[in-house]
């Protein structure tokens, strides 16, 4: 009974608990000065609202927006995050409930889900993979140097290419099967 209560508490953990208990310690491990509110800015004001966190360099100039939701309640939050990032000119956005981390490039082409570079589920991935992805996109030095954004853009191009292949391969295969083969006709 105690374990089921614990699981229920995790599921009902409010956004603030996810921010304080998961996000900020993760950012700290990734080298972010989480106590410098000019660099890791909570409740960053944007036109029409506030984003949960803005990761800034130089201070108060956001490079990444992070929106935090309760565990399992991140559906639909991508639209709000995209609007904030797009109107503010922020090149990268992260949506997390602490367990799942979705990394987006709001300025790229396509629907919201098509602009997702990577979706990381901390419970489904190997620890090394999770660490590698978090460092790739969110490590302080990589973000400040622009390497994180370059990596995200390269990963986006790979995802977009794979999506294009998936869309065109069935049509190409069908046209090959429909076309008469001149070698067989002779």
Language-model region placement:
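A short, conserved, highly charged catalytic patch centered on acidic carboxylates
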Residues: 1-92, 100-186
